[in-house]
């Protein structure tokens, strides 16, 4: 029934298996990839014809993590997988980016690639496996895919590269890098690093490329057994003659338009040239399809003119040299009520970045295959349509916004202080108000300044730059700080961010078959110079982290208590901690190790909660004076609560120096008093005194009461004249015979049974009376 084809290789200490022919057989291509006990299925389907009017390549990639893969049931009301999570969106983009350039120009058939995680062992991450499965499924499907590609994750720990590291190794190490590559060239790089040098980053990419080659060989071996017949693709018509005609008609107009430095003016001039070409097509009697094809040739002509000017004349669209950075203006404390803010402008790209500080309960909860986790640093990137002067959708973030936000997050995450150093939840927002190239790197620069403005003690400021590439044969030009048009018309989008000490993130997308090591090294070196320049401009706005938090930001104070005291602070059913929060107004969080975080925007509230907790966990000291409150009156004295959670007895004789007939005449419940600890017995019961403390000032008074004289007992005589000694056998007492023993019967009436819970109305009973 099944015609199963399978290929296995040893890869990174595990067995990688690619299998087809058993599952999803109606798809054009379907592959199950297995690494360890992690299993991913990717199925590819393609439309057999192109939709009318289609003028772009409609490739859609969906990555989904099934909760059943990790033996979990989804949370929430519906108990099933819902819309894509942030991770699923990011992995979908990770798969899409390296495979999209490998389809031929002019191929507009719709393609779906759906990758589903079916099993997860908690050790081998499924994202890399999904990339491999997608590449293999496309390769055997018969669609015109110029792959295959391989994918690999690389870590860097103790000076050594690690292929497909575990989560623990990534956390301990200095690098998390993902590479996708064909056998001959790197297609995509995505990374986060702890300020690593260009040499280490380049070495990691080359190490990953070697690992990708092994995967590519395995996919080719599978395709030799299971590939379907390749699709026949109609050859594109020779458009040389039409291009020459257009060059004569609008070539000068296009060249003049690309010399305009203002984006809006340039766009208007280009639209006029395109309209002129379209009128010519219609005048020649071309049908709508032919007109559309002609417009595509106009775009090719635009690319040719711009690329030639850069390569031959060294002239960029806005007149800059290849290494020149656009003018930069940075301003901090841009918004008066934000905890931290910055306005960062680079040429025609601008962002308003804000930093908001919160407490632990503001952390983002993430529910994934590994279970629940919490993230205390968030970065949200927003790209409204007005930023490019267009009308469009405004609302929930799309895939692009999620991806750009995560790139900026990776750039800034390595320089954050630890949660012990800075126990705040941090949310950065980057609202792009103008865009003409590299808005994600503007978000990095603006976000770094906003955190510094908020008083977040980051290690060092971070700057970012976007690099471009124009490659024709052996000739190439590397461009620093690319414009949007240079991105669209170029061959590479290479973003690098880092501090003065090293790289924190690197992202590269290649739109051609790949680049050489020489070009990669040159791009890294040129990016380093650009980052240093941008960092210098940022330092003019704010050279160091502000020493004080914003007056509008919450304050957090931490205190460590003995783990044995946690139950005392929380109380039965959380009664004590709820009372602290309700009374003081401060938020109180306590973890299993006894670390307490007290937060509020009011310092007095924090101090009140701190004193309360300190009183609960502190041990009373004999001879020390404390503030207390009367909580219960009894005939023989008063019980006083002090140090927040301790009770002691002030005996009636210790209330005043003079005799007190009735306690209620001089004290009342709820009355604030000052007491001195006289004694703590071995069972922890505390004896207090009020009479030796000035109730107004709390100062200790001299004890003027004379010490009690010991009672004289005199000579008690000889035992012999005191009557018979009482022992176990003699029941007489003082010569009198005792009456009969009273058993359960007799005339005493019914015996009173005592409730296990004690009297119903005892009032406040101190802890030491509950023993």
Swiss-Prot record:
Main location (coarse class): cytoplasm
Enzyme class: transferase
Residue span(s) of domain S1 motif: 623-691
Cofactor names: Mg(2+)
Domain (KH): residue spans on this chain: 554-613
Sequence segments annotated as region (Disordered): 696-771
Its EC number(s): 2.7.7.8
UniProt cross-references to PROSITE patterns, sorted A to Z: KH_TYPE_1, S1
InterPro entries per UniProt: ExoRNase_PH_dom1, ExoRNase_PH_dom2, ExoRNase_PH_dom2_sf, KH_dom, KH_dom_type_1, KH_dom_type_1_sf, NA-bd_OB-fold, PNPase
Reactions performed catalytically: RNA(n+1) + phosphate = RNA(n) + a ribonucleoside 5'-diphosphate
SUPFAM superfamilies from the UniProt entry: Eukaryotic type KH-domain (KH-domain type I) (SSF54791), Nucleic acid-binding proteins (SSF50249), Polynucleotide phosphorylase/guanosine pentaphosphate synthase (PNPase/GPSI), domain 3 (SSF46915), Ribonuclease PH domain 2-like (SSF55666), Ribosomal protein S5 domain 2-like (SSF54211)
Family in the record: Belongs to the polyribonucleotide nucleotidyltransferase family.
Role: Involved in mRNA degradation. Catalyzes the phosphorolysis of single-stranded polyribonucleotides processively in the 3'- to 5'-direction.
PANTHER family hit by this protein: POLYRIBONUCLEOTIDE NUCLEOTIDYLTRANSFERASE, POLYRIBONUCLEOTIDE NUCLEOTIDYLTRANSFERASE 1, MITOCHONDRIAL
Record protein name field: Polyribonucleotide nucleotidyltransferase
Species of provenance: Sphingopyxis alaskensis (strain DSM 13593 / LMG 18877 / RB2256)
Gene: pnp
